[in-house]
Amino acid sequence: MTTASPQDIAARLGSGLLSFPVTHLRADGSFDEAAYREHIAWLGGHDAAGLFAAGGTGEFFSLTPAEVEQVVTAAVREAPEGLPVIAPAGYGTATAIEMARAAERAGAHGILLLPPYLTEAGQRGLVEHVRQVCAATDLGVIVYSRANAAYSAPAVAELADRCPNLIGFKDGIGNIEQMTRIYAEVGDRLFYVGGLPTAEMFALPYLALGVTTYSSAIFNFVPQFALDFYRAVRRNDAPFVLNALAEFVIPYCELRNREPGYAVSIIKAGMTVIGRPAGPVRSPLTDLDDAELAELADLVKKVS
């Protein structure tokens, strides 16, 4: 894709559905680049606004920094012209900066900054963490508010003032009051991403808060359904959305909730169901069993 400013990338990402591809692994757990690139090409035939390589759905937490760079590089090389590829950065500040620089080497068009690893920090510490990462790269940065990195409205406003390349805020907490406060303070200076697990569950009410897009993991294996659902959300078609929730999304979430970590495992199971297997999940995650796989297959038939 031709060189685009962080603001151009933000406008593109905020205008459509966001794809979070799985990372393909062989039986021995190694990265299967050929299969991954084929999947990226297949997803590129559908109308996503951006592709987030090696994110949470892509098992970022189980990949080494070198593997993350390899996955991002493969995504950049295979993604169709004009589709932004966003790379992850995370862990402590120093490691996140290294990963941001690796994203630049790989040719990524932006960065999703995941929460720091295994530590608690106050708002001053979180602001400084984001500020340092933003200062270390020319790429646009999207900050992910989740778990141990829950950003307050004043913190987000300060970051928007201090970091010209902070372009987006992804919410993985689901606090409606907090999102309302953030949008009231920051407004359209950032674009907003719904980032709760199976974000389709929250997409319609979040639209009213200025959240115009969300991370779709199910796009991996039911891309047309995911796009139809997103378009219904954007046109405020509540009857369509509610019917789709009842028919597929809610029972899918019930299956997802049976085991911790199934939010990722069930996506790879969906890939198996449609005949495009992506390999196993890495430990400590576990794959769905045969009975659960059959349940998922029945659900997929309803929307395929």
Swiss-Prot record:
Annotated pathway, please? Answer: Carbohydrate acid metabolism; D-glucarate degradation; 2,5-dioxopentanoate from D-glucarate: step 2/2
Pfam families associated with the record: DHDPS
Keywords assigned: Lyase
Asked if Flavoprotein is a keyword of the record, the answer is: no
Provide the GO biological process annotations: D-glucarate catabolic process
Catalysed conversion reaction: 5-dehydro-4-deoxy-D-glucarate + H(+) = 2,5-dioxopentanoate + CO2 + H2O
Q: Which domain of life is it from?
A: Bacteria
Output the InterPro entries linked to this UniProt entry.
Aldolase_TIM, DapA-like, Dehydro-deoxyglucarate_dehyd
Q: Which residues form a coiled coil?
A: none
Q: Does the keyword Lyase apply?
A: yes
User: Which CDD domains would you find in this protein's record?
Assistant: KDGDH
For this protein, the Enzyme Commission number is: 4.2.1.41
- Principal EC category: lyase
Q: Which GO MF terms does the UniProt record name?
A: 4-hydroxy-tetrahydrodipicolinate synthase activity; 5-dehydro-4-deoxyglucarate dehydratase activity
HAMAP family named among the record's database cross-references: KDGDH
Q: Which family does it belong to?
A: Belongs to the DapA family.
UniProt-recorded name of the protein = Probable 5-dehydro-4-deoxyglucarate dehydratase
Query: Which organism's genome codes for this protein?
Result: Nocardia farcinica (strain IFM 10152)
